[in-house]
């Protein structure tokens, strides 16, 4: 056996001068990147005033302080006295707490699925699988991908019963009972070996458990997320209620989209209900973190690897996709498992890992079409590893590679074949003009969310101007990636090893391609763990070659993690109150929903009183709780929403309700500043329905038919009756409570060119906004666009201006300044009901006011 020294040796065994020069040059490059990154971070915080935004609700901040105090009281004594018990105690307490909060069935259902998936994946990987925690995570994701495949077909058949899935999940466990015992013993042994000897290791482990505990607490809350209640929880609930999925693309526009994650949620939902689905999502995060930790251990000692895993877990986006049922945790875990299988192929030459990578890639594509760039970029690396072990793969390696490609196609294609068979569009509802479907007007094109140019500013903007890339607050992307991305690219110059190279190319390349197509920050979530891996490699290099740089990177990591923790709720609007105070209380879920999502309780009341009756959700997409026939006035039911928009007279609206057999309506209570689209629908509901139940701003009403043949009576305009108080100098967004809206207005957070991404708009004549201020000048901010009309401006009851907001091209944050005598004043902006001949509408919007 020969040993090949990787470096030329000079006198006394010292590296040659050229090698030293290269190391020094690379160290200087890393130092320059760190210095530039820190400077950009400081500039971003100063320019963006991020700490001035309302990240936490007051009660949320109090709960965070309580959580920190409780964690320290519990963790510090354990860390000092018996640190080897810390991991086991944390897992035990989490298990007991989960059972108390969600009931025993939910965690048992998730545990059954995970053990079954791990057993199935381990059997597929061979008789001598890797029983380490990252190895078991890989096997679990492989088994999950296998379960996703048949569920694509079974979901549409009436075979989905709890007993059926309990038996199906039990089969791999029974067939591999010895392996299950061995893996459980290996897990127990791993816990015993987590001794946390050094203080650095203890601190890193504590940080990881701390932030995972925060995600666990929000995962225990009832679902309140719009996407989940409209689709990702609705699918499991529908399947459990009818034993098959009854959603069809003729009405539900998303009914044939990729649903790999939803199939996993559906399996556990049948056994443990909603809580099981949410816990399965959290379990996918744990699996992802375990694999990321395993990848970091290739270059780092345990303390630093734990810190890298914790850094990813602190990313605010993690709380967004873990605190509500999104698909991103499942997708990211499948993608990282695919990459881990490719690495194992390179290390072992075992063709089973090639097949595993293919199945995992197919599972990722079945979960989200956005996985395509990740899979495409991974294929060359899998091919390279197969080429390196060409003779070892099998006696017929070419056939083996063809089988792998067929496995990928076979596991990925069914979702898109079903979509094509049902709609004539494999990507329905997108690309409708290229693949015309009978369910959409051929001129319609469903637009995706955000479209920002990808350039050298993108990384800075997505970090500090996150509102342009996500319906969230600035700073919600995570502060580490401004450093990680350039460090990962720089690492390609000096870090040896294909794992770091493949992770960097696939992660950063897929993120670039995705942002060019749709710059929604959530869509590159699956690339973030991959981008973290080459950073771990760079960190490992500095540990060996520059301790000063290593300590600087560790310090940056800790600071970024701390900032991320503070900004965790910035990634959405659902968890700014942190955990629910009723988590462990009897009927705590309903008590939480009373103020967080009262429409869910109104829908339950409808289910109890009118099972089987058809209901229209007038301004909501929460169909997860509906057990009868449901229509939505939203883009999720595109044709329904279009039909309602076109029904501008009573006979047409009444005809729709008769055609759909709608007898009940759930709608928000009419109030000042809240608009129901189209406005005629509000008039119809006010005149033609009778109130039956009201809770938390939502009403259940019965269609009476009393106004049949009559035009709806006009309803007095709702007026904001809150007392007005003059505000001082500053900029006030349209969502600020200092603004008082009268009449029907619609508020949106999804306008990327607007101030803070928010706009409030209406075309109702007479509707207005009042704003009291104390100053010498006030500026009205608005948007000029193709469908704008005139806005009449009055100050202290005196007419000041009539502004034409029309422009053939959108002009964001347009301004009109008015000077007044110093002191308190009130400005009013009202919809004039007039427009220029070229305008397509008479809309008026409010983007904010600036007081001087």
Identify the residue ranges that each predicted region occupies:
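Hydrophobic, aromatic-rich transmembrane alpha-helices
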Residues: 70-81, 209, 287-293, 383, ...
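Membrane-interface transmembrane helices that cradle and orient dolichyl/undecaprenyl
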Residues: 125, 338-353, 388, 539
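Glycan-recognition surfaces in beta-rich domains, encompassing non-catalytic CBMs
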Residues: 708-852
